[in-house]
A protein has these predicted regions:
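Flexible beta-alpha connector loops of hexameric P-loop NTPases
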Residues: 14-24, 72-80
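Switch II (G3) loop of P-loop NTPases
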Residues: 39-49
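Switch I (G2) and immediately adjacent beta-strands of P-loop GTPase domains
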Residues: 30, 34-35, 45
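Short beta-strand-centered segment that lines the nucleotide-binding/catalytic pocket of NTP-utilizing
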Residues: 1-10
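Acidic, Mg2+-coordinating active-site environments of NTP-dependent enzymes
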Residues: 36-37, 63-117
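Conserved helix/coil segment N-terminal to the catalytic DExD/H
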Residues: 50-57
């Protein structure tokens, strides 16, 4: 399955997304639908907002991937500053068994801070 910015995909069913990472109850509903469809894996885009708002708290991800970080989610309704944004993004790597990191990104050290994978 897939949960992402554009849509969620559960088998042959495509569901338009309202948020990159839905509210926690909706993520659980999607996981159940995927299991009911016989799916045994999901690729999920986890936003910094989802991490900040605990939408995926309690989940253990097999693999987390960090590609890059740009200052595009700073503002009144997102993150107060870049440091907060980077911290929230880094929270994913406290919930993963394996982390894959872009070693060329200038913010790598901040993203890896506190990682457990």
């Amino acid at each position: 399955g897939l949960i992402g910015t554009i849509e969620s995909i559960c088998g042959d069913k495509r569901i338009p997304s309202a948020n990159t990472t839905p509210e926690s109850y909706r993520v659980q509903e999607l996981f159940k639908e995927m299991v009911d469809e016989g799916l045994d894996a999901v690729v999920m885009e986890v936003s910094s907002q989802a991490l900040m708002l605990h939408r995926v708290s309690g989940f253990t991800f097999d693999i987390g991937v960090f590609t890059n970080l740009e200052p595009d989610h700073i503002g009144e309704h997102e993150h107060k500053d870049f440091a907060d944004y980077m911290h929230c993004k880094s929270l994913l790597f406290r919930q993963c068994r394996l982390g894959i990191f872009n070693g060329d990104d200038e913010h790598l050290e901040g993203i890896m801070k506190g990682h457990t994978c």
